[in-house]
Swiss-Prot record:
The gene is ptl1. This is Triacylglycerol lipase ptl1. Lipid particle-localized triacylglycerol (TAG) lipase. The lipid droplet/particle is a lipid storage compartment which serves as a depot of energy and building blocks for membrane lipid biosynthesis. Involved in the mobilization of the non-polar storage lipids triacylglycerols (TAGs) from lipid particles by hydrolysis of TAGs, releasing and supplying specific fatty acids to the appropriate metabolic pathways. Residues 182-358 form the PNPLA domain. InterPro entries: Acyl_Trfase/lysoPLipase, NTE, PNPLA_dom, Triacylglycerol_lipase_N. One of its GO terms (biological process) is lipid catabolic process. It is found in: Lipid droplet. GO terms for molecular function: triacylglycerol lipase activity. It holds the Pfam family Patatin.
Length: 545
């Protein structure tokens, strides 16, 4: 059985390389065909240029605006009408909120927001509204989100509401709006892609508080969970050079590394970097240090019959690094890594399965037992941002935010083939004909709420990065691949997540500004003491002999 698992593990790692070759070839073919048909102009060629030349969000934004104006699609943004969202409702609400704020009508604004603070209010989160233009969506939608955030700021600063009323409002608003989870899903050969996604979200102030990861995605999620906000800029700036130092200490760059991991830059190098940063910190300690919540998804073979989620609620004293090793138990170097827990005296002990009560242990991996559902239950998550880098699942995914260069008919056929493959694999899983060890390779878990999936886009030149000895430029390149995959999703994420982040920050500031009233005893003690001292002094001065 072990030999069979090793065979499939090696085959899975090679899928990434094979799939990279296939996707790169078709990307190159579509690009060449598109450019020849467009004769070097139009938005389709613009997409090729943007993926090729842009190295920052600012450059991408400028070029996106230029392409939209040149293609004639820029006017679409300034036309509110569309059958893809309720533009009349959004326009009416924007006008009402602006009027309440200008007139300082606090209580009507309060009631209005409590009933309308929804992530997809009026269907403004519809992903098809963000593929018409590269640079953004309808101006009306952006104005509505901006006005909602202006009203939240107004309610936070107003003196007409008591502290208790503000706390009740922001607490209810956060529960009603829900939270977002950034889920780093797998990725043997493309683990650095996750880091690029996180870097872009942080730079745009869109990094969620709740993080989750499995396999190599667990490495990136755990790394982000131990750095405070003021420390993250330093991490993102120094990560490539620090990882390159570790790569220089590795001398084994043979073809066997490609066969084993699908890439010359294998997971052990990234793991060495993360291990040095995590130390013996636990889930509870990481949350208390940074306020970020990390969820590590452990596979069935590590703890029970179904994937389990380890976080500061379910495993507060477990070392994050040991959970990361369990999540990467597919790799030979972490095959027998146990979970470790920190004791009150600072020592560690091995956690056996009997130390935990897994709520869905032994059950088939249904909707309630998958990690997405578990995270949603614990943390009120109703929106997932999934960074998908599991190469075996790429054929079954359809990135709705990609501005595809193929015709509409061809795109529908590609989508049909992907859906059919996913459906057949899921049928085999339901019938019990797909072995559990192979399930994670071909079947993705059902997401019980709204989500957006970010997948890397490859070019034909990416082949050299997978089959050559890694360099500093290669590390920077794979991070850039993740950044580029995120740029096109920024307008959608700003609409879906900006209000949530504002609510979190304002609630935090409101809590920090609270001053506990002094008790009667605390007030009386120093006053009485000073009064007695003054009375003694006065008696001495005016003492009548």
């Amino acid at each position: 059985m072990t030999a069979l698992f090793n065979f499939w593990r090696i085959m899975y790692a090679n899928i990434s390389s094979i799939w990279l070759l296939v996707v790169s070839f078709f990307e190159w073919l579509f690009s060449a065909t598109s450019i020849s048909q467009q004769r070097g102009s139009g938005p389709r060629k613009g997409k090729v240029v943007m993926n090729k030349d842009c190295r920052s969000w600012e450059d991408w934004k400028v070029l996106a605006t230029t392409i939209d104006k040149a293609s004639g699609r820029w006017k679409w943004r300034f036309t509110p009408a569309s059958d893809k969202y309720d533009y009349l409702l959004i326009d009416r609400c924007t006008v009402s909120l602006k009027r309440y704020r200008q007139r300082k009508s606090v209580y009507p604004m309060l009631m209005f927001l409590r009933s309308s603070l929804l992530r997809n209010f009026g269907n403004i989160g519809n992903s098809s509204l963000y593929t018409e233009n590269y640079s953004g969506t309808k101006i009306l939608i952006e104005e509505y989100v901006r006005e909602v955030n202006n009203c939240l700021e107004f309610l936070y600063h107003t003196k007409r509401l008591s502290y208790d009323v503000k706390c009740d409002f922001f607490s209810a608003a956060r529960i009603s709006f829900g939270t977002t989870c950034l889920y780093f899903n797998g990725g043997t050969a493309f683990g650095l892609y996750h880091f690029g996604v996180a870097k872009t979200l942080w730079k745009r102030n869109l990094l969620p508080q709740i993080l989750a990861g499995c396999a190599s995605g667990a490495l990136i999620a755990s790394l982000l969970s131990v750095y405070r906000d003021e420390e993250l800029n330093g991490l993102f700036d120094t990560f490539p050079s620090e990882l390159w130092k570790i790569c220089q200490q590795t001398s084994d760059y043979s073809l066997s590394k490609v066969v084993e991991y699908g890439n010359m830059l294998d997971i052990s190098m990234i793991a060495s970097f993360v291990r040095q940063r995590l130390g013996t910190i636990t889930f509870q300690e990481a949350f208390e240090r940074t306020g970020r919540i990390v969820n590590i998804v452990a596979p069935p073979s590590a703890v029970s019959g179904s994937p389990q989620v380890l976080n500061y609620f379910t495993a507060p004293n477990v070392l994050i690094w040991s959970a990361v090793c369990s999540s990467n138990s597919w790799a030979a170097i972490y095959r027998s890594s146990p979970l470790l827990a920190k004791l009150p005296d600072g020592s560690t002990e091995v956690c056996t399965p009997k130390n935990f009560i897994w709520p869905y242990a032994g059950l088939p991996n249904t909707g309630r037992s998958n990690p997405y559902a578990r995270i949603s239950e614990i943390f009120n998550v109703n929106h997932f941002v999934i960074t998908q880098s599991r190469p075996s699942l790429f054929p079954t995914f359809y990135d709705e935010l990609h501005h595809h260069r193929v015709s509409g008919y061809s795109l529908k056929m590609i989508r049909l083939v992907g859906l059919e493959m996913a459906y057949r694999f899921r049928q085999l899983d339901i019938l019990g004909l797909l072995p559990p060890r192979l399930r994670r390779f071909f079947v993705d878990d059902y997401v019980p709420s709204a989500y957006i999936t970010l997948t890397p886009t490859f070019s034909f030149s990416d082949i050299k990065h997978a089959f050559t000895k890694p360099s500093l430029s290669d590390i920077q390149y794979w991070i850039l691949v993740g950044e580029r995959a995120t740029w096109q999703a920024i307008p959608l994420l700003q609409v879906r997540c900006k209000t949530e982040i504002s609510l979190r920050h304002l609630s935090k500031n409101l809590t920090n500004s609270y001053v506990e009233p002094l008790s009667v005893n605390n007030l009386a003690s120093p006053f009485v003491t000073n009064l007695e001292e003054n009375q003694e002094k006065m008696l001495k001065i005016f003492k009548v002999k």
